[in-house]
From Swiss-Prot:
It comes from Campylobacter lari (strain RM2100 / D67 / ATCC BAA-1060). SUPFAM superfamilies: Ribonuclease H-like (SSF53098). GO terms for cellular component: cytosol. Belongs to the YqgF nuclease family. The lineage of its organism: Bacteria, Pseudomonadati, Campylobacterota, Epsilonproteobacteria, Campylobacterales. Gene3D superfamilies: YqgF/RNase H-like domain. Transmembrane segments: none annotated. This is Putative pre-16S rRNA nuclease.
Length: 128
């Protein structure tokens, strides 16, 4: 069983993979040029890793929660993914990733976003 986690932002999509609910790792982030390009790159990951579950971060709370959730759900609909999709609270995931000090915050290469996806994927499966 393989699960792909997505931290969907307007400029970057953080990506992480979990295998057999036991081993998780961040993958290379997707730099968004447009919605369709980003969706196609996510589809490549889904096919390459034979993914059967998606865990998608959505921010809970705050004034933009409804708008962001709608954007995230619309993006997921572009994937034509017919297997399980779970939406999880991604609040503070980027902040928690920053606190690990493992990424250069000046670079906008998506490593922070993939680390955030990795963290909420680990939490989803209760991994340490």
């Amino acid at each position: 069983m393989k699960t792909l986690a997505l931290d969907i932002g307007l400029k970057r999509i953080g990506v992480a993979l979990c295998v057999n609910k036991s081993i998780a790792m961040p993958l290379e982030a997707i730099i968004r040029k447009n919605r369709n390009q980003a969706a196609n790159e996510v589809k490549k990951y889904i096919k390459e890793y034979d993914v059967n579950t998606l865990v998608v971060g959505v921010p809970l709370g705050g004034s933009s929660e409804d708008e962001m959730r709608k954007r995230v759900e619309h993006f997921i609909s572009l994937l034509d993914f017919d297997k399980e999709v779970f939406f999880v609270d991604e609040s503070f995931s980027s902040k928690n990733a920053q606190e690990l000090g493992m990424v250069n915050l000046k670079k906008k290469d998506g490593k922070l976003d993939s680390l955030a996806a990795y963290l909420f994927l680990k939490d989803f499966y209760g991994l340490t």
